[in-house]
C-alpha cells in the first residue's frame, strides 16, 4: 500500500508536464509531449493508477477541450479508444499538427514509438497535417497556374493582333499594285481629244471610281437591246486576258504588235468573228435590217446563247488603224449606265469593222414621236424620256473618265424599252468613224437641225454642243415637230420658230401655242414649265451660258429653282438666248449660212441613201433634211 502512493506522484509528475505542452503547443514547442508518451505504456501493466490520477488533473482538463475546439477532427479520433489519457494525448498532439512545424515530431514519434498511444497521435497528426499541407501546396500551385494562363492568353492576343496588322498591310499593298497595273495612264497626245480635256493624272486617279460605278450600274440595266447586262460570249471564243471579272474579259490578239499602254488592259468585252456575226444575222439579210445611216447598216442578230443583239457595220475608210479602233472601243465598252446602251463586242475582219450592241426592242423616240398611224405619246411619257436621256448624257459628260462627248444627240439615237425608258445609243461612234489625222474633219458630225452654232463656225464640238442638241430634242418632245419641218419655212428651223414662243410662254404661263396640238392641253403646267425652261437654256447661242446636263436633270426633277438656269436673267429677256454682248453674239443669219454650207458638203459626199426605216438606231444626219439647197455657183 505504501508503494502505491510513492508511485502515484511520479505518474502525476509525468502527467503534469502534459498540460504545459498543450499551452506551449501554440508556441511551437511540441517536442515536450513526445518523451513522456512512452511512459504510459511502461505503467500500462497496472490499469488502476490511471483512474486515481484522473482526479488531480481535473482542473486542467478544460484546456485540452479548448485545443480540441480549435480542431474538431481529433475528438473523433480519440473517441475511437476507451483510454481517456490516450485520447487527451491524442488531443494534445493535434494542436501542434495545425501548424507546419509539428510534422517532424510526429514522424519521430512514429519512428521511436512502438506503443499503442503513439499511433493514434501519429495518425491523428498525419491526418490533420496532410490537408493543410496539401491545401497550401494546391494554393501555391493554383496561383502559379493562373499566372501562367494569364501570360499565355496575353501572348496569344498580342500575336493575333500582330498577325492582323501584317495581313492588312499585305492586302493594301497588293490592292495598290493591282490598281496600278489595271489602270494605266491614258495615251498622251491628241488621241483622246474627243473625250473631253481631262488631265491624264486625274483620269488615272478617277478611273477606278468609274470602273466600280459602271459595274454597279450595269446590274440595274434591264431594257437594253435584248435586256440586261452583256451575255456570255458565244463559242468558240478567243483566249481571255485572265482579269478578275468574267464580264470584263477579252482576248489579247497575238497578231498585233506590242500594244500601247491604253491597250495593255485588253479588250473588256467579247470579240466576234465575221462568220459568227453572219450566222447571228442570217447572212446580213434585208429581213434583219433595222436601219442605215451615216455610220453604216444595222442588223438584228441572235447569238448562240439566245441573246438578241444589234450588229452595226461601220462604213469603211475611217482612217483609223486597228489599234486605235480597239483603244476607242475599249473605252466605250467600259461605259455602263441604266440610260445608256451597252456595247457587247466588236469584230475586225479584212477592214470591215462591226460593233455589237444590246438590242432595244421598242424602237426609237423618233419613231414613236413622228411615226404615222401611232397613238399620241402622253406628256408624262415625254417627260420621263427627257429625264432618262438627260441622266445618260450627264453620266457621259461628268462621271466617265475620260469624259465622252456624244456628238450626235437626236431623237433617232434615243432608244426605248417597253416601259418607255430612254437609252442613249451610238455614243462614241463619231470618234470611231472620224479621220484621226485632223481634229476638224470635212465630214459633218451630228445632224442638221441639232448642230450647235459653235460647230457651224469652228467645226469643234464640246459637252455644251451636246447640251444644245439635247435642247433641240426637248423642243421635239414639247412641240411634236421635227428639227427641220415641212410646216416651217425653209430658212427657219425648229429652234428659230420656238424661241419667241418660249419667251412669251414663260412670261404669261400659257404654253398652248408652243405645246404639241395633239396633246389637246393634257399636260401638267408646272412640268411643262420645267421642260420649256430647260430647252430655252440649252439652246442659247453662247456655249458658256448653257447649263450642264446635271443641272438640267435637277431642274427636270424639280429639285432646283428654274431661276438657277436663267442665271438671274428674266425668261423673256433676249439675253437668255444670246451672249452678254452683241459683238460676241453669233447671229442667226451666220448660223443659217454655215448650216447650208455644211449641208452642201455632206450631200455632195453622200454614200448612203436617206432611209425612213423605223428601227434604225442611228439614222443618217441627212434624214432630217427636207430640201437640198441650191448648189453653190
UniProtKB/Swiss-Prot annotation:
Signals that turn on the gene: By ABA.
Species name: Arabidopsis thaliana (Mouse-ear cress)
Recorded name of the encoding gene: PERK4
Stated role: Required during abscisic acid (ABA)-mediated activation of Ca(2+) channels. Regulates ABA signaling pathways. Modulates the expression of genes related to cell elongation and ABA signaling during root growth.
Catalytic activity: L-seryl-[protein] + ATP = O-phospho-L-seryl-[protein] + ADP + H(+); L-threonyl-[protein] + ATP = O-phospho-L-threonyl-[protein] + ADP + H(+)
UniProt-listed GO biological process terms: abscisic acid-activated signaling pathway; calcium-mediated signaling; root development; seed germination
Region Disordered: start-end pairs: 1-145, 193-255, 608-633
GO (cellular component) term, any one: plasma membrane
Keyword Ligase: no
Listed transmembrane segments: 152-172
Protein name per Swiss-Prot or TrEMBL: Proline-rich receptor-like protein kinase PERK4
